[in-house]
Amino acid sequence: MNAGVETLDLRPLPPVERHKKIFHKWEALQPGEVLRIINDHDPKPLYYQFEAEQKGKFECQYEQRGPVDWIVNIKRT
């Protein structure tokens, strides 16, 4: 793990387990730290969930947008 970056590869996980795993990792982050998510589809629904539950507490930035893998960095603010 890079300093301040926690990478979570969701591709091997069943879809039903993914959001639970993401929010478990998210809760452990300190302000300024980043959760780097690697996924096999665009995690846009995850963004909407963060917007509803964590509004004002995160910044989201795509590092890669498909076509096979999506990488998103979610920073705790």
Stretches found by the model and what they are:
Residues N2-T77:
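Positively charged, polar, low-complexity stretches
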